[in-house]
Amino acid sequence: MPINQVHRYKAQMLKALAHPVRLLIVEKLLEKEQCVNDIRELVNVSQPNISQHLNTLRFSGIVDFRQQGNLRCYFLRNPQNIKKVLKALE
């Protein structure tokens, strides 16, 4: 069976979730949309580090953001898929 786009998407998603900080960010975003400063306080890591993790999640198609003035607020693009993945890990 050849590798197709669906396999690549799933692998990319799992790879992006395979870091404790990113996993915590995703769990917090399951609760509600969060702005960058809120996320930084919740996970207690530096601003540049948070930005790097959020970019990884965004480029993997897991999160997206909306601009509120000077703030970037992040949300999960497909929370149902994330819930399924996290449930499978229990």
What are the residue ranges of the model-derived segments?
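Short, Lys/Arg-enriched N-terminal segment that forms or immediately precedes the first helix
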Residues: 1-14
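Conserved segment of winged-helix/HTH DNA-binding domains
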Residues: 9, 73-90
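Short capping segments at the starts of secondary-structure elements
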Residues: 20, 30-37
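Pre-recognition alpha-helix immediately N-terminal to the DNA-recognition helix
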Residues: 23-25
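Helix-turn-helix DNA-binding motif, specifically the short coil turn and the N-cap/start of the second
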Residues: 35, 46-49
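Alpha-helical residues within the helix-turn-helix
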Residues: 40-41, 52, 58-59
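Beta-hairpin "wing" of winged helix-turn-helix
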Residues: 59-69, 75
